[in-house]
Amino acid sequence: VDSTALLLGETGVGKDEIARFIHQNSGRSDRRFVPINCGAITESLFESELFGHEGHAFTGAGSNAKPGLLEAADHGTLFLDEVGELSLNMQTKLLHVLQNRSFIRVGGNESVRVDIRVIAATNCDLEEMVRQKRFREDLYYRLNVIPIHIPPLRERKNDIIPLAQHFLDYYNQKYDFHRKLSPATCFALLNYRWEGNVRQLKNTIEQATIITDTDLIQPESLPMNVAGSEPVQEVPAEAGLNEMLERMELRYLQTFYERYGSIRKAAERLKLPPTTFLRHW
């Protein structure tokens, strides 16, 4: 499948990572993945960045021609992040490329053909923007061939600990640490709402990895709003310390068991003996 995909979801859910994953598992994986943040580029620069320009095409352009991002993505994937931020004028120019698979460099006369796959992403409600005449309907249908809805992290509870462990592995390698997440820390991570989604979780794990002074990351190393996120009903006031820790550990192990589907795989991922799981079942 080489169709255009539209990734839909809140800011921070990991749309850019998913776009890269799609590219890396496509027939174009040996070619370039070229991202462009549509919300960070001004309309005056849009054409020259996307289409490139000929020498002396405008003031300050220089004497040499400069290929744009479309040519850089030829035979590869162009990722249009925050596509809902494009002005109507920019939308029209993008639509022309998608329809004709060709463009003209700024200051040029010859049409340049490209073979690209387009993946777009947005946190906007494009259907509502179409109704409000703020987004072109024809462009919307061009982009929305394969819509992929990415739920917020708070609706994917079973992903929180595996993602946290993934980020911890990354930062352990980056900083040459051997950090681990304590059951109490996992309990706090599971019960936080993560309004900033995967991006916030990644930043939280990096911060905790750096500031903790032991290899076992405790809630005290988390931001205060995350560390204090345990719901009261999860740990009754009458519960003793041992019971509370048992509940935390059980919740921690259950999360990995549900994620990997077997005690053996979950134990291998956590580098624990299977008996640690069995004594809770």
Q: PLM features: residue spans?
A:
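Nucleotide-binding/hydrolysis machinery
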Residues: 5, 26-31, 107-117, 124-229, ...
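Short gly/ser/thr-rich secondary-structure transition/capping motifs
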Residues: 56-64, 100-105, 128
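Base-recognition residues in the alpha-helical recognition helix of bacterial helix-turn-helix
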Residues: 92, 96, 104, 275-279
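AAA+/SF3 P-loop NTPase mechanochemical coupling elements
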Residues: 34, 64-75, 79, 87-93, ...
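Conserved post-Walker A coupling segment in P-loop NTPases
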Residues: 1-60, 71-87, 152-157, 204
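Conserved RecA-like P-loop NTPase ATPase core
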Residues: 13, 36, 50, 73, ...
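Bacterial C-terminal helix-turn-helix
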Residues: 236-281
